[in-house]
Structure formats: C-alpha cells, structure tokens
Amino acid sequence: MEWSLTQSKLLAFHRLMRTDKPIGALLLLWPTLWALWVATPGMPQLWILAVFVAGVWLMRAAGCVVNDYADRKFDGHVKRTVNRPLPSGAVTEKEARNLFVVLVLLAFLLVMTLNVMTILLSVAALALAWVYPFMKRYTHLPQVVLGAAFGWSIPMAFAAVSESLPLSCWLMFLANILWAVAYDTQYAMVDRDDDIKIGIKSTAILFGRYDKLIIGILQLGVMALMALIGWLNGLGGGYYWAVLVAGALFAYQQKLIANREREACFKAFMNNNYVGLVLFLGLAMSYWHF
C-alpha cells in the first residue's frame, strides 16, 4: 500500500510538471536553440547546449507548477483543468511549493557552471517565471509576459556563448514575444468562454472578434523579424525557405482557427511546434559546414 501511494504521488507530480505534455517545453526549446546557433555561430559547445536543454525542461516544469499553484482556485471551475493535481487534491499546496523550489534549485545549479553574465540574467528568468501566472488576474496581456518568460533564454544563450547581447539577440527576443502572443492567444481561445465566466483575463478576450486578424499580423511580424535576423547574420537562401515554410504553417493555423472551434484552435496552437522546428532546421543548415 505504501508503494502504491508513492507511485500515485509520483504520477501526480509527473502530471503537475506536464512531463506528459512536452509541447510547452518544445515551444521554449526552439527559440533557445535558435539563439545558441546564431550566437555561436553554428553548433555550440556541448556542455552549454546540455545546460540549456536541461534548463529548458526544468524551468518549464517549474513554470507549470507555479502556474497551477496560482490557478488552483480557478482550475476547479474550468472543464479542461478540473482534474489537475492541485484542484483534485492529488498534490497539496505545500508539496507544490517544495517541488517548485527543487526544480528551480536544480536549474540554478546548472546555470552556475556558466559565466557571471548568464548567472545574473537567470535571476530575471526566475522572476518572469514566477510573475507570469498571476498576470492573468490583473491584465489582458499575460501572453506578453509569457513571451518574455519563454524568450528570456535568448539573451541568456547569447551571454553564455559570447558574453554580449547584440541587435540580433533583441530582434529574436521580440520575434519570440510576438510568436508567443500569437500561439498563446490560440490556446486562450479554447478557454475563452470559461475565462470570461470566472474573471480570468487574456488576449483572446481583449482581441475579441479581431483575434484572427491580430494573430495574423503578429505572425507576419515574426516572419519579418526572423528574415531580418537572417540578413544581419548573412544566412543563406535555405534559411529564407525555412521562414517561408513557417509562413505556410501560419497560414494553415489561420485556416484552423477560422471558425473559432475549440479543438481546431488547440490544434493550431500545437502546430506551432513545427514552426519552431522548421526555423531551427533552417538556421542549423545555414551554419552547417560540409
């Protein structure tokens, strides 16, 4: 019986950290890899790459824990989240707080192996991860904070590789914010009706009937900024083909969200994994030396 309870608790932690749903970690991973490849340029040192990949998974898990902790009183009223570990009682509030601390400490131990500039920037990463979940109570723009949180690995990657934060770093950071607002608005469209009832704010609610148009404008902005990064760094034609493929994926997402159906909006959100992958492959191939 004791082992059964332990198994049950571990499974609850697994669900709380969303390790069974890697999409969030992947959306955090791709911009991190973009930054590492542009900053190097090309393949970064294996240890730096390992630190950032592990850090992405740890901080995404920590972000999920603090997000569910912040939303624990709301999630019980939303159909999609009612069975999450905290509202269902599978994990206690104290256990969630302790798990968050452990994950953050592990991530910080990894960052401590890098240079001072990266360590200092990591403090802002922690602050953004902690603040984001609470923003949806006070502003209709929590997706902007999410974009900054998911994109903060970009200046950290540049700092770790080159100890500098050039123009390309901040253009990529801005591109990631636009991209995050676009895809998280798609995600928020799934819960829009429930969020309105319980008082949660989001860009999906703020944009209203202009949601599809604004998402499209944001997606065009992502393409323009990523193309500009390619030009500034002298990337080859293959990279621009990758940007165009990303544009085709954005067009497909627009088709999916056309009728604002919940399942289709969620499918559009999930499709953004391929946008990040395609752009990374374009960068990696541009820096590949045969």
UniProtKB/Swiss-Prot annotation:
- GO terms for biological process? ubiquinone biosynthetic process
For this UniProt entry, what's an example GO CC term?
plasma membrane
Broadest EC class assigned to this enzyme: transferase
Transmembrane segments in this chain: where? 23-43, 46-66, 99-119, 141-161, 163-183, 213-233, 234-254, 268-288
Q: Which residues form a coiled coil?
A: none
Q: Give the pathway listed in the UniProt entry for this protein.
A: Cofactor biosynthesis; ubiquinone biosynthesis
**Membrane-related topology note:** Multi-pass membrane protein
Q: Give the reaction(s) catalysed.
A: all-trans-octaprenyl diphosphate + 4-hydroxybenzoate = 4-hydroxy-3-(all-trans-octaprenyl)benzoate + diphosphate
Keywords, alphabetical:
Cell inner membrane, Cell membrane, Magnesium, Membrane, Transferase, Transmembrane, Transmembrane helix, Ubiquinone biosynthesis
* Highest taxon, organism lineage: Bacteria
Q: Which Pfam families match?
A: UbiA
User: Recorded GO terms, molecular function?
Assistant: 4-hydroxybenzoate polyprenyltransferase activity
Q: Which PANTHER family match?
A: 4-HYDROXYBENZOATE POLYPRENYLTRANSFERASE, MITOCHONDRIAL, PRENYLTRANSFERASES
Q: Which NCBIfam families match?
A: ubiA_proteo
Protein name per UniProt: 4-hydroxybenzoate octaprenyltransferase
Q: What lineage does the source organism belong to?
A: Bacteria, Pseudomonadati, Pseudomonadota, Gammaproteobacteria, Enterobacterales
